[in-house]
From Swiss-Prot:
UniProt binding sites for Mg(2+): D81, D123, K124, E491
Molecular function GO terms recorded: 2 iron, 2 sulfur cluster binding; dihydroxy-acid dehydratase activity; magnesium ion binding
Protein name (Swiss-Prot/TrEMBL): Dihydroxy-acid dehydratase
Family: Belongs to the IlvD/Edd family.
Entry keyword set: 2Fe-2S, Amino-acid biosynthesis, Branched-chain amino acid biosynthesis, Iron, Iron-sulfur, Lyase, Magnesium, Metal-binding
TM region(s), chain numbering: none
Length: 615
């Protein structure tokens, strides 16, 4: 049986100094022999998705200690992508994922912790912790802070559900008065929690359920609801049990790499496609699989996207549907249940909480269980009161949404579309692929051909959109914004939001080697690989070039002759694959270090040290 890792620092005469330091943290003689479990928190007052986490780490710690473990809490950083959006702060968002993964590894390995509870929530925090969990491979349970309640605002006598993206769009839409924009701003983000649509944060927290690393309800139970407290308490108890099973019973099935296998990543990606999750999840699942030693690639995602239907549309794809509505329809296990009934799920896999995913579905899928407890759990409703306090209300819907024909979650027979909510496109402008969130694309533009309008920064594209230089039928190309070229692979929420505010959301396409916020909708194609800074063909596009997009056939094509592209490539090679004009962008040493080691979006923008020239 494997020895508890913590005994490296708690046992033996030569560890007297280490034990002395442990004693200074509050440990007693009786604690030296218990598993030491890291409570990996991410509390910060900068981020609404994390502002309520301050005391929750200690809540989990108390449960760990009551169950026979020793809990030690630390925090990671957390970047709010919405606040960092639209300026150079966004350069730091994706790099923060790797910094979080490293910091968790550093703390857990330096102090020889035996297991972890990862308290995450927002965009890069869950992926960063997930990468660390795969890398370290000790027992872990994920529990997130939970989704924000959707905002409510009355405009022109009618109530509207809304979220952060609505505030961005309204601010740039001249048809809204200043008073209406202010009302939307004040109502868009009413509570603590991750932004209320199927954006990146909520998508990732849902995917931890499909991977088998979090408890049912983790992705959809509101941050404000009292039911969410149960998830935190149970996580504390569960991680001690997992610890004992591994270290005392030699049960390797509880380890993250035993749970998050290739088939588990297929399950997670199938869920993502079915629920129209954020395109960023592709980037993060590829990175997590890399850390787990799982060969999960863009080709695998392409294969799944061709057979998994779109079973749910949530904001931004459907502006009046939010995570609270998904929860009412049975949450993530309801979507997994529909995938299972369609023969699209691997149900024999273990989870942290059940022997198999199939067992968990029998208990938690609202269409196959009669459990009053489960049904009450999924009737958890928003409180409708602005607050930054977790678990502060216990309202219930009168009934569940079990309509699988026209409801929030559909059966495969009544899917929103037979094609899933995400697609991978390949072509001469994206040899290694690119990603589009098809759930947010109007059916009328699934096939689109138009002239390119080329911009070499997000800022330049935003200026062009707001000043009327982009017109109906254009393909907006934003390049040199990839992992290396940005550096940091900025999100493009403002360009897509401004296209919508100008009435061009279903009249233009946007193509970039950067990425998109989970709040993005429209014909927005990101992660173009290879990126311009690495010699990708997106760097060869010129104004007026015709670009042909065919989502049903999964192709994207730059209609320029091969000999012309070869000539352009020679010219770019001579220039060193850089933007034509110097950008007013300060790139720090930290960001330059990130750029030196990162890889393309097609690989999850993971680090590859072989790129460094080390003597």
């Amino acid at each position: 049986m494997p020895a508890y890792r913590s005994r490296t620092t708690t046992h033996g005469r030569n560890m007297a100094g280490a034990r002395g330091l442990w004693r200074a943290t509050g440990m007693k003689d009786s604690d030296f022999g218990k598993p030491i479990i890291a409570v990996v928190n991410s509390f910060t007052q900068f981020v609404p998705g994390h502002v309520h986490l301050k005391d929750l780490g200690q809540m989990v710690a108390r449960e760990i200690e009551a169950a026979g473990g020793v809990a030690k809490e630390f925090n990671t950083i957390a970047v709010d992508d919405g606040i960092a959006m639209g300026h150079d702060g966004m350069l730091y968002s994706l790099p923060s994922r790797d910094l979080i993964a490293d910091s968790v590894e550093y703390m857990v390995n330096a102090h020889c912790a035996d297991a972890m509870v990862c308290i995450s929530n927002c965009d890069k925090i869950t992926p960063g912790m997930l990468m660390a969990a795969m890398r370290i491979n000790i027992p872990v349970v994920f529990v997130s802070g939970g989704p924000m309640e959707a905002g409510k605002v009355i405009l022109k006598g009618k109530e509207h559900a809304l979220d952060l993206v609505d505030a961005m769009v309204a601010a740039a839409d001249e048809s809204f008065t200043d008073e209406e924009v202010t009302a939307i701003e004040r109502s868009a983000c009413p509570t603590c929690g991750s932004c209320s649509g199927m954006f990146t944060a909520n998508s990732m927290n849902c995917l931890t359920e499909a991977l088998g690393l979090s408890l049912p309800g983790n992705g959809s139970t509101l941050a404000t609801h009292a039911d969410r407290q149960r998830l935190f308490l149970e996580a504390g108890r569960l991680v001690v049990d997992l610890c004992k099973r591994y270290y005392e019973q030699d049960d390797e099935s509880v380890l993250p790499r035993s749970i998050a296998t290739f088939e588990a990543f297929e399950n997670a990606m199938s869920l993502d496609i079915a629920m129209g999750g954020s395109t960023n999840t592709v980037l993060h699942l590829l990175a997590a699989a890399h850390e787990a030693g799982v060969n999960f690639t863009m080709s695998d995602i392409d294969h799944l996207s061709r057979k998994v239907p779109c079973l749910s549309k949530v904001a931004p794809a459907k502006s009046d549907v939010h995570m609270e509505d998904v929860h009412r329809a049975g949450g993530i296990y309801a979507i997994l249940g529909e995938l299972d009934r369609a023969g699209l799920l691997h149900t024999h896999l273990p989870t942290v909480h059940s022997r198999t995913l199939g067992d968990a579905l029998n208990q938690w899928d609202v269409k196959r269980t009669n459990s009053p407890t489960v049904q009450e759990f999924f009737r958890a409703a928003p409180g409708g009161v602005p607050t930054q306090v977790a678990f502060s209300q216990d309202r219930r819907w009168k009934e569940l949404d079990l309509d699988r024909e026209t409801g929030v979650i559909r059966s495969a027979e009544h899917a929103f579309s037979k094609d899933g909510g995400l697609a991978v496109l390949f072509g001469n402008i994206a040899r290694e692929g690119c990603i589009v969130k098809t759930a947010g694309v109007d059916d009328s533009i699934l096939k689109f051909t138009g002239p390119a309008k080329v911009y070499e920064s997000q800022d330049a594209a935003v200026t062009a959109i707001l000043t009327g230089q982009v017109t109906s039928g254009d393909v907006v190309v934003i390049r040199y914004e990839g992992p290396k070229g940005g550096p940091g692979m900025q999100e493009m929420l403002y360009p897509t939001s401004y296209l919508k505010s100008k009435g061009l959301g279903a009249a233009c396409a946007l193509l970039t080697d950067g990425r998109f916020s989970g709040g993005t909708s429209g014909l927005s194609i990101g992660h173009v690989s290879p990126e311009a800074a690495e010699g990708g063909e997106i760097g060869l596009v010129e104004n007026g070039d015709v670009i042909e997009i065919d989502i049903p056939n999964r192709t994207i094509h730059l209609a320029v002759a091969d000999d012309v592209l070869a000539q352009r490539r020679a010219e770019q090679e001579a220039k060193g694959w850089k933007p034509v004009k110097e950008r007013p962008r300060k790139v720090s040493t930290a960001l330059r270090a990130y750029a030196a080691m990162t890889t393309s979006a097609a690989r999850g923008a993971v680090r590859d040290l072989s790129q460094l020239k080390i003597d």
